[in-house]
Amino acid sequence: MACCAPLCCSARTSPATTICSSDKFCRCGVCLPSTCPHTVWLLEPTCCDNCPPPCHIPQPCVPTCFLLNSSQPTPGLETINLTTYTQPSCEPCIPSCC
């Protein structure tokens, strides 16, 4: 499945991290699997949705909001400009077990 709608874009930031970015036309989910020991097929971008979708099941990753606000290392994210959108209708971020 391709990432996002035509008005969205994806950016591969490192071999283990792909960010599906947001713009003013569409909201895209974000999945950062760099801290999980998963195979390459899990590194595909997530697709557009009202809320960031979970990582691939049955091996979920740590939710992005937890990764970006934790002390865990996130390689390749130092030079990325991230725009955060809060969506009250979304479920609260609860860290998953990797």
UniProtKB/Swiss-Prot annotation:
One of the record's GO cellular component terms: keratin filament
Residue spans of the Sequence repeats: 3-7, 8-12, 47-51
Acetylation found in the keyword field: yes
InterPro entries the record matches: Keratin_matx
Record flagged with keyword Acetylation: yes
Function comment: In the hair cortex, hair keratin intermediate filaments are embedded in an interfilamentous matrix, consisting of hair keratin-associated proteins (KRTAP), which are essential for the formation of a rigid and resistant hair shaft through their extensive disulfide bond cross-linking with abundant cysteine residues of hair keratins. The matrix proteins include the high-sulfur and high-glycine-tyrosine keratins.
Quaternary structure and interacting proteins, as annotated: Interacts with hair keratins.
Protein family: Belongs to the KRTAP type 3 family.
Protein name: Keratin-associated protein 3-3
Originating organism: Bos taurus
Gene expressing this chain: KRTAP3-3
